[in-house]
């Protein structure tokens, strides 16, 4: 039966993906992740939750800038797909994710990787906006407790934005109002 064969093949890729992650064999994990993401995107939540960590390691160890950028773009596509399909993914997840949780994870992985990837479009302002959106979403719509590392990084970025916009007259700083609201 073709359906049974497809299921067996899919389970094999999932098993190899999980084993590759456990062995920290990022290149092998990537090959299996890619098949799962394309052919069985709802087969396992780890495609979305563990995929970004795999990409983080692929990006930090890759020397070729074009490959780094391709990995970065694929990693960001995980968050787009996850936010789009969150309800369907939660329908079979043991631990449900909220939109705020996903956005906080996206902000973290963007901030950890984008500054080190040429042509990623990284800006301090975009990093700030990602964190602000995540924290606002969690506060308005609920989510898990905001992790201390997320808040700490957000405050550090907010402080950097304030300093980048500093003028001799601190009241003339266009970011001042946002900065005060962040705290």
Which residues are covered by each model-predicted region?
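Preference for long, solvent-exposed alpha-helical segments and helix-linker "stalks"
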Residues: 1-183
């Amino acid at each position: 039966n073709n359906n049974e064969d497809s299921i067996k093949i899919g389970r094999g890729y999932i098993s190899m993906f999980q084993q590759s992650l456990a062995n920290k064999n990022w290149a092998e994990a990537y090959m299996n992740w890619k098949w799962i993401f394309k052919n069985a995107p709802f087969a396992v939540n780890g495609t979305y939750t563990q995929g970004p960590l795999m990409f983080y390691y692929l990006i930090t160890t890759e020397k070729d800038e074009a490959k780094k950028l391709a990995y970065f773009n694929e990693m960001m596509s995980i968050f787009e797909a996850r936010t789009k399909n969150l309800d369907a993914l939660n329908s079979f997840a043991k631990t449900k994710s909220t939109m705020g949780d996903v956005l906080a994870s996206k902000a973290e992985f963007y901030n950890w990787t984008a500054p080190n990837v040429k042509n990623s479009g990284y800006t301090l302002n975009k990093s700030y906006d990602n964190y602000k959106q995540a924290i606002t979403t969690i506060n308005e719509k609920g989510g898990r407790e905001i992790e201390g590392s997320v808040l700490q990084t957000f405050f550090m970025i907010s402080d950097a934005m304030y300093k980048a916009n500093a003028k001799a007259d601190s009241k003339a700083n266009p970011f001042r109002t946002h900065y005060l609201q962040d705290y």
